[in-house]
Amino acid sequence: MVYQGNRITVTMLEDGIANMQYNAENESVNKFDTETNKQFAEVVNALEKADDIKGLIVTSSKGVFIAGADITEFVASFKQSEEEIKDWVININDAFNRFEDLPFPKVAAINGAALGGGCEMTLVCEYRVMSDKAIIGLPETQLGIFPGFGGTVRSTRVIGIDNALELIATGTPKKALDALKLGLVDATVAADDLQDAAIDLVKKCISDELDWQAKREEKLVPVKLNQLEQAMAFNSAKGMIFAKANPKQYPAPALAIAAIEKHVNLPRDKAIEVEAAGFAKAAKTPQAESLVGLFLSDQLVKKLAKQHSKKAHDINEAAVLGAGIMGGGIAYQAASKGLPIIMKDIKSEQLDLGMGEASKLLGKMVDRGKITPAKMGETLSRIRPTLNYGDFAETDIVIEAVVENPNVKRAVLKEVEGLVKDDCILASNTSTISITFLAEALERPENFVGMHFFNPVNRMPLVEVIRGEKSSEEAISTTVALATKMGKVPVVVNDCPGFLVNRVLFPYFGAFDLLLKQGADFAHVDKVMEKFGWPMGPAYLIDVVGLDTGVHGAEVMAEGFPDRMKPDYKGAIEHLYENKRLGQKNGVGFYKYEMDKRGKPKKVADEATYELLKTTTDSDKQTFEDQAIIDRTMLAFCNETVRCLEDNIVSTPSEADMAMIMGVGFPPFRGGPCRYIDQMGLDNYLALCEKYAYLGKAYEAPQKIRDMAAAGETFYATA
């Protein structure tokens, strides 16, 4: 035994070949946490002193090779100064550099995901052999940072500037064959043959069949491209990367490119220093704080979903009531994850529409090469369309997805309750109707919950699981388990008008309506909010949702929260709806819609909208600075999020933030409404509320904000 630790061991195999194995005790995956970094440095010390080692393989005892750095440690680490972060990273890099410089060949045997620091560990080896089931990549830019353990330095020298920039800037991991084509790995083999293949490579190095020292040397020197070739590579990459990610919103790719431009002409050790300085700069951006926080929130939400699922019944078959686009989307989602599902409607044309939706979605996957035609047929066979309830006796859970009308929903739920087994869970896919109210029609209200999918079902990850007054833990558990089984991220919320997401969204629409009443141009508001980071502004969003849906939802919300969601004027949204402008669904809303070459609706300006809005705009029109537009819309949005926490509609800031990002597209780089308030500072946010309180209750600071500001608290821990 060369080294024995609880994170890494080094043992001798045969013929002078050592096996350095990552094996984090009591952990599901290997990662570069503080203890692993410490032990890695100790391993390097031991290897430098060993005189009987001729070669070495790097392996993992886990299903994952190495998942990367321990992101939970980033929060504290990134609170350090930029200079301290740089020194911290350089210190870690010292062990990587010394490992690379060891006087014998090293081969990484990549059995599973090698991400971030895991990929960087493989790059300090001369050769990399990969299981055909593994993935490899440098996803750090998705956290607002970029590789800091030599990843930008070695990748540019191993796979070239253009390939390295694409790998780093997109953050997308590569499958084995793609990694092989890129030159990121040297061979791919079946998982069972991996260790033997790695040992064989080491033996070829030892016998001088392979020039491993030349492979190492190319990572120690500047990139072998002349200035013109470098300029072409960087300019091409910048054009592609900046077209996909606005550097003002997501600065990490731009900072990575800047660091690489500086270090491509430097030897390794100097280049590592440049990388470390750039990494430290990225780590201190608010976007890194938000995106690291978002990752941790995502982990928490998934952990809470597991906890909520503990009392779940087995789900062997589901059913959806109501076909059409929504029902078909739900059926597709279940079937694509291996769950048989019955799709029931009273009209055969709706069943055709639902099956057509599922077929269309699967057909697109076939076209992209994601699945085979045979797999498509197998998936479709899991969906059973029917006009009657004959097969419902053994169904474990029924999702009601009929028209958004409380009387229709109550009647349908009452009917199906009498036809299913006693422990069958009933779930209503409603966006605004009270679950407690719908439950009044049922004999077994404890078996009833809300299950709010977002449209389009196949693309929107969030599902709100709504607890009514009488919903049992078993019902909640089973519904959460179903959502997870369907590949969705469930967030459990308590019952109220609009639940969580729509309750927060409608004050945002209300703030937008008030801006228009006072003279703002809806197209300009859209541009401002898109620049702020939203995928679409409020006018475009309500067009996509449907103005009819918006008006109906606003009526429900006004009844539930008349103090802040019942305006004393007719707004632009309602007026356009009354003039039969429904948005994309009938081609005219705030914008006019024309089909592009791909058959997708494209928005264009429509003078008729401005004519109609003259009747809902004040005669003494105001002009608004862009920041005022942002402040007014975001105050209404964030205040209602905080009120949902106050009212225990949602349990944690993490769940609230993730729901707003996944459900309505809150800018991820801002971390969610709670983190947005934290980054603004509670005192500054409170002052902004007081500045705009004259506009109405929606703009007044919730008591929770006042209490937190007085106590010097934040939504997220600062240490």
Swiss-Prot record:
NAD(+) binds at M326, D345, V402, V403, E404, K409, S431, N455. One of its GO terms (cellular component) is fatty acid beta-oxidation multienzyme complex. It catalyses: a (3S)-3-hydroxyacyl-CoA + NAD(+) = a 3-oxoacyl-CoA + NADH + H(+); a (3S)-3-hydroxyacyl-CoA = a (2E)-enoyl-CoA + H2O; a 4-saturated-(3S)-3-hydroxyacyl-CoA = a (3E)-enoyl-CoA + H2O; (3S)-3-hydroxybutanoyl-CoA = (3R)-3-hydroxybutanoyl-CoA. Its EC number is 4.2.1.17, 5.1.2.3, 5.3.3.8, 1.1.1.35. SUPFAM superfamilies: 6-phosphogluconate dehydrogenase C-terminal domain-like (SSF48179), ClpP/crotonase (SSF52096), NAD(P)-binding Rossmann-fold domains (SSF51735). Pathway: Lipid metabolism; fatty acid beta-oxidation. The active site is at H452 (for 3-hydroxyacyl-coa dehydrogenase activity). Residues 1-190 are annotated as: Enoyl-CoA hydratase/isomerase. One of its GO terms (molecular function) is NAD+ binding. It holds the Pfam family 3HCDH. In the N-terminal section; belongs to the enoyl-CoA hydratase/isomerase family. This is Fatty acid oxidation complex subunit alpha. It comes from Psychrobacter cryohalolentis (strain ATCC BAA-1226 / DSM 17306 / VKM B-2378 / K5). The lineage of its organism: Bacteria, Pseudomonadati, Pseudomonadota, Gammaproteobacteria, Moraxellales.
